[in-house]
Amino acid sequence: MKAISDVFERVARASCVIKLAHAFLSLALLAAPLSAQVPPDESWRTLETDHFRVTFPAELEAMGRRAAGIAEKAYDELSAEFIEAPGGMIDLLVTDHIDQSNGFAQVNPSNRITIFARPPVDDPGLGYIDDWMELVITHELVHIVHLDRADNVVGKVARGVFGRVTGPWPFFPGTGTPRWITEGIATWYESDLTEAGRVKGTFHEMVLRTAAIEGRFEDIGQASGGSPQWPTGTRPYAYGSLFFDHLLTKFGEDRMAAFVEAIAGQWVPYRLNAAGRDAFGVSLSREGELWGQELYEEGMSLDS
C-alpha cells in the first residue's frame, strides 16, 4: 500500500509542477509589448452583444458601440463566407491611449482583440481604406476565426484535457504557420468584406511588381522572414494577400476555407504543400514560382 501511496504522491507533485510551469509559461508568452499596455486607471465601460464583450474608455462610448456593431457584422459575414466562427464570447478592447494605428488578436487564454482607434495617416501600406475601424476589426477577427480552429481529434482532445494551451499543433495548428499565411488570409478578407483594403489598393501590387522586374521577387518561404531591407514588415502582408488572391481567382474563393481546414485537420503538422494540394490541387511552392513568373511578365509588358 505504501508503494501505491508513493506513486500517487509523485503523480500529484508532477501535476502541480506541470500546472505551475504552464502558468508561468503562459504569463511569459502573453506579456504584450509596452505600447500595447492600456492604462489601468482609465474609466472603462463594457457592453455585451451576442458574440462580443466590448470594453472602451467612457469618453469613447459612441465609438465602442459602433465597434460592437462592426464586429457582429464581420462575425456573421465570416461565418457565412469563410469558416464557422468560434463559440463563446470574444473580448474586444477599443482604446486611443497611444498615437498608433494598429490592432492585434490572441487566442490564449481566450479569444481577445485589441484595437488602437487612431486612423492611419502616415503608412502607405494602409493608404487605401474607407473606414479604419471596419477594416482593422475585420482583419483582427479573421485571425480569431482562423487561428482558433483545430479539426484534428488530437487537438480537440488535448484542448479538452489541458485547456487553451499556448502553442501550435495540436492545440492551435494555425498559429504554427508562416506569417504570410496568417497575415495573408486576414488581409485578403479585410479587402473582400469591406469597401477598401490592401488587396484592392496599389501599394502591395507595386511592391511585388517592382521586386519581380528587378529580380528580387522572393519565394513564399522567404516572404515570412524578417529583414531590415525594404519592404521590411510589409513583406508577409503583401506577398501573402496577393498570393491568396491569385490562388482564389484561379481555383475559387471557396478554397480558402478548405485550405484552413486542411491545416487544422492535419495529423502530421506543418505540411503546407500537402494542405495546398488538398485545397487547391497544387503545391504551394510550385504555384508560387508560376505566380512570380506571371508578375514578372506582366511588369515587363508594362515597362515596354
Regions found by a protein language model. Name each.
Residues 217-240:
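Catalytic-site signature segments of enzymes, centered on catalytic residues
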Residues 141-157, 185, 191-203:
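Catalytic Zn2+-binding segment of zinc metalloproteases
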Residues 188-218, 253-261:
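Short helix/loop segments within enzyme catalytic domains
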Residues 36-178, 226-229:
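Juxtacatalytic substrate-recognition/specificity segment
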Residues 19-32:
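Bacterial N-terminal signal peptides
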Residues 74-79, 181-194:
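An active-site-proximal "capping" alpha-helix that borders the catalytic cofactor pocket
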Residues 1-17:
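N-terminal secretory signal peptides that target proteins for export/translocation
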Residues 37-48, 52, 72-73, 231-235, ...:
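Beta/coil-rich, acidic/histidine-enriched accessory regions frequently appended to metallopeptidases
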